[in-house]
């Protein structure tokens, strides 16, 4: 609950909000300038903290709902383990324009990566799936990012290859999945012709024969490969996912980025 506005019993309200009876300590707790007037604390709140550990199927709504529940309070979110979006269609982390928080501090710890999900490999004339976005920001500079780790768009899925434009099961190769966790294009139960699934650390490889083969999945921030071979039909690889889309945040530390960013 925020400190009351003017006019109001700011001193008493500041003690209740911050737990600090000395006004200079209370002012520091709500991040206003010291020395200064007590009225500068009107409407301010203490920061509320959240740590998010490793999750390879993360739902962006978990964080969005938590931020909304804090009302106007500023929030500090620390990512302590690798996060991967649950879908290429959803950013791993999303910050809508109508969040009520005074500001949002996002800290990505050293050795930790926020990933968009990798695209799936193709089995036909359609391109491999596009990689997903790591962070979508519609909150502008209200979002402050201190990236001590990495932010990575998902890799695109690999394109397919076939002897015929109908892409029959007995004459086609499936594309590899994009990193991370893109699903390889499956050609029946044939493990050689099928593309392999991507893992957290590696892109999937395309299925192959001696004469032709499917494209490999893309690494983070990279598109998938096209199918290859002479006198065969091939499809394109999927596009790379972006690291950060939407509006530019307040970059306190850009850190390591794979893919495009604003």
From Swiss-Prot:
<feature type="short sequence motif" description="GRM 6">
    <location>
        <begin position="193"/>
        <end position="199"/>
    </location>
</feature>
<keyword id="KW-0946">Virion</keyword>
<dbReference type="Pfam" id="PF21721">
    <property type="entry name" value="Gp38_N"/>
</dbReference>
<dbReference type="InterPro" id="IPR007932">
    <property type="entry name" value="Receptor-recog_Gp38"/>
</dbReference>
<feature type="short sequence motif" description="GRM 8">
    <location>
        <begin position="213"/>
        <end position="219"/>
    </location>
</feature>
<feature type="short sequence motif" description="GRM 2">
    <location>
        <begin position="126"/>
        <end position="133"/>
    </location>
</feature>
<feature type="short sequence motif" description="GRM 7">
    <location>
        <begin position="201"/>
        <end position="211"/>
    </location>
</feature>
<keyword id="KW-1227">Viral tail protein</keyword>
<feature type="short sequence motif" description="GRM 5">
    <location>
        <begin position="182"/>
        <end position="188"/>
    </location>
</feature>
<dbReference type="Pfam" id="PF05268">
    <property type="entry name" value="GP38"/>
</dbReference>
<comment type="similarity">
    <text>Belongs to the receptor-recognizing protein gp38 family.</text>
</comment>
<dbReference type="InterPro" id="IPR048291">
    <property type="entry name" value="Gp38_N"/>
</dbReference>
<protein>
    <recommendedName>
        <fullName>Receptor-recognizing protein gp38</fullName>
    </recommendedName>
</protein>
<feature type="short sequence motif" description="GRM 4">
    <location>
        <begin position="166"/>
        <end position="179"/>
    </location>
</feature>
<keyword id="KW-1230">Viral tail fiber protein</keyword>
<dbReference type="GO" id="GO:0046718">
    <property type="term" value="P:symbiont entry into host cell"/>
</dbReference>
<feature type="site" description="Interaction with the fiber protein p37">
    <location>
        <position position="37"/>
    </location>
</feature>
<feature type="short sequence motif" description="GRM 1">
    <location>
        <begin position="116"/>
        <end position="123"/>
    </location>
</feature>
<feature type="site" description="Interaction with the fiber protein p37">
    <location>
        <position position="22"/>
    </location>
</feature>
<keyword id="KW-1160">Virus entry into host cell</keyword>
<keyword id="KW-0945">Host-virus interaction</keyword>
<comment type="function">
    <text>Receptor binding protein (RBP) that is at the tip of the long tail fibers and serves as the phage recognition site for the attachment host receptor. Probably uses the host receptors OmpF and TTR.</text>
</comment>
<feature type="short sequence motif" description="GRM 3">
    <location>
        <begin position="153"/>
        <end position="163"/>
    </location>
</feature>
<keyword id="KW-1161">Viral attachment to host cell</keyword>
<dbReference type="GO" id="GO:0098024">
    <property type="term" value="C:virus tail, fiber"/>
</dbReference>
<feature type="short sequence motif" description="GRM 9">
    <location>
        <begin position="222"/>
        <end position="227"/>
    </location>
</feature>
<feature type="site" description="Interaction with the fiber protein p37">
    <location>
        <position position="9"/>
    </location>
</feature>
<feature type="short sequence motif" description="GRM 10">
    <location>
        <begin position="229"/>
        <end position="242"/>
    </location>
</feature>
<dbReference type="GO" id="GO:0098671">
    <property type="term" value="P:adhesion receptor-mediated virion attachment to host cell"/>
</dbReference>
């Amino acid at each position: 609950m925020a400190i009351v506005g003017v006019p109001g019993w700011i001193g008493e309200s500041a003690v209740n909000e911050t737990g600090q009876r000395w006004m200079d300590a209370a002012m520091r707790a709500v991040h206003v300038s010291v020395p200064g007037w007590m009225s500068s604390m009107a409407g301010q709140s203490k920061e509320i903290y959240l740590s998010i550990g490793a999750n390879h199927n993360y739902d962006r709504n978990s964080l969005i709902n938590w931020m909304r529940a804090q009302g106007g309070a500023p929030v500090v979110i620390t990512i302590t383990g690798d996060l991967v979006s649950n879908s290429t269609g959803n950013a791993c982390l999303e910050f809508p324009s109508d969040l009520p928080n005074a500001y949002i501090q996002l800290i990505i710890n050293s050795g930790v990566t926020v990933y968009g999900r990798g695209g799936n490999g193709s089995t036909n004339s359609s391109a491999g799936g596009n990689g997903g976005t790591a962070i979508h920001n519609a909150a502008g500079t209200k979002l402050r990012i201190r990236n001590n780790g990495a932010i990575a768009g998902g890799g695109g899925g690999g394109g397919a290859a076939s002897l015929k434009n109908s892409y029959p099961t007995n004459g086609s190769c499936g594309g590899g999945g994009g990193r991370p966790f893109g699903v390889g294009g499956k050609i029946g139960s044939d493990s050689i012709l099928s593309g392999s699934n991507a893992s957290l650390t590696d892109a999937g490889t395309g299925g192959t024969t001696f004469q032709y083969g499917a494209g490999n999945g893309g690494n983070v921030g990279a598109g998938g490969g096209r199918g290859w071979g002479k006198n065969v039909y091939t499809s394109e690889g999927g596009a790379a996912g972006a690291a950060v889309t939407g509006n530019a945040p307040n970059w306190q530390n850009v850190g390591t980025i794979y893919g495009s960013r604003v």
